[in-house]
From Swiss-Prot:
Name of the protein described by the UniProt record: Acyl-coenzyme A thioesterase 2, mitochondrial
Enzyme Commission code(s) on record: 3.1.2.2
UniProt lineage: Eukaryota, Metazoa, Chordata, Craniata, Vertebrata
InterPro entries in the cross-refs: AB_hydrolase_fold, Acyl-CoA_thioEstase_long-chain, BAAT_C, Thio_Ohase/aa_AcTrfase, Thio_Ohase/BAAT_N
Gene it is expressed from: Acot2
Enzyme class: hydrolase
Native source organism of the sequence: Mus musculus (Mouse)
Known pathway: Lipid metabolism; fatty acid metabolism
N6-acetyllysine, modified sites: K83
Length: 453
């Protein structure tokens, strides 16, 4: 009987589907044994749509079919980053009366998350290696997300009923990746597939240095020419950042503005953390910047001097006695920077800027006081007759507001501090913030920079 069933399946269209999106196993139908239900043979399939592959910021539709009515199951997800670090999540579910389970309709009953969370198996992933942040280092290869369906509600003990592997890409089909070595500028430019010119954006990350491309590559798939810009600890750039010379960033701005596939007259800036601070300084000192999105950035120079021509902004003072220790043994440094209202020379002169700003703020950011900084920037701009910036605050969101579905990085090594610190955030609230922030910044840039010519 089993052999003949396999023969039927081999001849069916089900067995012709991509193995990366469909998997099936025989398991027994439910049997009643003295009032207890045990699960016998079923033909479970796990489907993931879009089929086979998708971009990282795309939502997925995950469903299981062929289960027994109301069968309890556990869904598990896993991926490894380029350094071999494992990230995993799991959630307990129960099939409906028809033996189906659709994550868009079925709430998780517990595990890494609970409730109706269709993308929880991604954003709720946690690293096996403590304090490890999920970063995509090579955007030319996908993350492989492994999904499994297990019988019962034990995340490690149930029989595997079905499995699938789904590719999560960071380059939309046709997006062009162009390494940039022009003068001193070290960067990578991402261009949409079709002919331009396109609205241009410079993308800046934080104090970790190097060249991170994954946000720029995803954003290029939305119709922007995006240049991921390195500014230290990459290639032949300086290995440390005692002084941030705005002339380097000016060279990058001029390069992007003059590119034949970039629409003028001005460009946009996107920066997070230290990158947000630098974006604010660029908008204050440099010409040709029409719009800037600052994600949890500082209004003051932090950890190093900012310099442009004959002008310098010294770093804000450190208040070492304000560093706290959490119950988990992490440093909490949110109170460890002097207020720029006290260290006034460290305040970036935003009043000089004619840039239109959007500030995206995690209200549980423990890296520094992002909400306070955004409010003070708004006050200063308005006091000098400038346009009031848009500020969007996200309750319980932490410091690293990434593109959608990246897991929360709530703690980790801070290179300027030289120790592990808490970055704040609650996983579900942070995931909600990331989805909204991603849409908000795209809408903002399209409005301020326009679409392609």
């Amino acid at each position: 009987m089993v052999a003949s069933s396999f023969a039927v399946l081999r001849a069916s269209r089900l067995c012709q589907q991509d193995w990366k999106s469909w998997a099936r196993l025989f398991v027994p139908p439910p049997l009643s044994t003295g009032g207890r239900t045990t699960w016998a043979r079923t033909n479970a399939t796990l489907s993931v749509e879009p089929e086979g592959r998708s971009c990282w910021d795309e939502p997925l539709s995950i469903a299981v079919r062929g289960l027994a009515p109301e069968q309890p199951v556990t869904l598990r997800s896993a991926l490894r980053d380029e350094k071999g670090a494992l990230f995993r999540a799991h959630a307990r579910y129960r099939a409906d009366a028809g033996g189906e389970l659709n994550l868009a309709r079925a709430p998780a009953l517990g595990g890494s998350f609970s409730g109706l969370e269709p993308m929880g198996l991604l954003w709720a992933m946690e690293p096996e290696r403590p304090l490890w942040r999920l970063i995509k280092r090579d955007v030319q290869t996908p993350f492989l997300v492994e999904l499994e369906v297990l019988d019962g509600h034990e995340p490690d003990g149930g029989q595997r009923l079905a499995q699938a592997v789904h590719e999560r890409h960071f380059l939309a089909p046709g997006v062009r990746r162009v390494p940039v070595r022009e003068g001193r500028v070290r960067a990578t430019l991402f261009l949409p597939p079709e002919p331009g010119p396109f609205p241009g954006i410079i993308d800046l990350f934080g104090v970790g240095g190097g060249l991170l491309e994954y946000r720029a590559s995803l954003l290029a798939g939305k119709g922007f020419a995006v240049m991921a810009l390195a500014y230290y600890n990459y290639d032949d750039l300086p290995k440390s950042i005692e002084t941030m010379h705005m002339e380097y960033f000016e060279e990058a701005v001029n390069y992007l503005r003059s590119h034949p596939e970039v629409k003028g007259p001005g460009i946009g800036l996107l920066g997070i953390s230290k990158g947000g601070e630098l974006g604010l300084a660029m908008a204050s000192f440099l010409k040709g910047i029409t719009a800037a999105v600052v994600i949890n950035g500082s209004v003051a120079a932090v950890g190093n001097t900012i310099s442009y021509k004959d002008e310098t902004i010294p770093p804000v003072s450190l208040l070492r006695n304000q560093v706290k220790m959490t119950k988990d043994g992490l440093l909490d440094v949110v109170e460890a920077l002097q207020s720029p209202l006290v260290d006034k020379k460290s305040f970036i002169p935003v009043e000089r800027s004619d840039t239109t700003f959007l500030f995206l703020v995690g209200q549980d950011d423990h890296n520094w006081k992002s909400e306070f900084y955004a409010d003070e920037i708004s006050k200063r701009l308005q006091a000098h007759g400038k346009e009031k910036p848009q500020i969007i605050c996200y309750p319980a969101a932490g410091h690293y507001i990434e593109p959608p579905y990246f897991p929360l990085c709530s703690a980790g090594m801070h290179l300027l501090v030289g120790a592990n610190i808490t970055f704040g955030g609650e996983p579900r609230a942070h995931a909600v913030a990331q989805v909204d922030a991603w849409q908000q910044l795209q809408t903002f840039f399209h409005k301020q920079l326009g679409s392609k010519s």
